[in-house]
UniProtKB/Swiss-Prot annotation:
Pfam families membership: Pterin_4a (PF01329)
Top-level lineage group: Bacteria
Sorted UniProt keywords: Lyase
Enzyme class: lyase
Protein's recorded name: Putative pterin-4-alpha-carbinolamine dehydratase
GO biological process, one term: tetrahydrobiopterin biosynthetic process
Homology family: Belongs to the pterin-4-alpha-carbinolamine dehydratase family.
Known EC number: 4.2.1.96
Organism per entry: Caulobacter sp. (strain K31)
UniProt keyword ATP-binding present: no
Length: 96
């Protein structure tokens, strides 16, 4: 598999809504709020299944109904199209 090309956080944000630059590194982040823990965990489960398919895994933190996500591509040393793909998937299922 070829190494993903770095596009950078700014380019990624121009394609997404509600995401922000993570200041410590070339990454993007978003916080999702759900009705309760079960909804948050269901979201994380669906994302985990997609992450395995893409072989691209998020950094995240969960407390009750809140899921904080950070996306970056380690092989690209920054944000790549894989992060945009994952972010769009997350946004799509978070509102479903």
């Amino acid at each position: 598999m070829s190494r993903p090309a770095k596009i950078g956080a700014t380019a990624a944000l121009s394609q997404l809504q509600g995401w922000a630059v993570v200041s410590e590194k070339d990454a993007i982040g978003k916080t999702y709020l759900f009705a309760d823990f079960n909804a948050a965990f269901g979201f994380m489960t669906r994302v985990a299944l997609m992450a395995d398919k893409l072989d691209h895994h998020p950094e995240w933190f969960n407390v009750y109904n809140r899921v904080e996500v950070v996306l970056t591509t380690h092989d690209a040393d920054g944000v790549s199209d894989l992060d945009v793909t994952m972010a769009r998937f997350m946004d799509g299922i978070a509102t479903a």
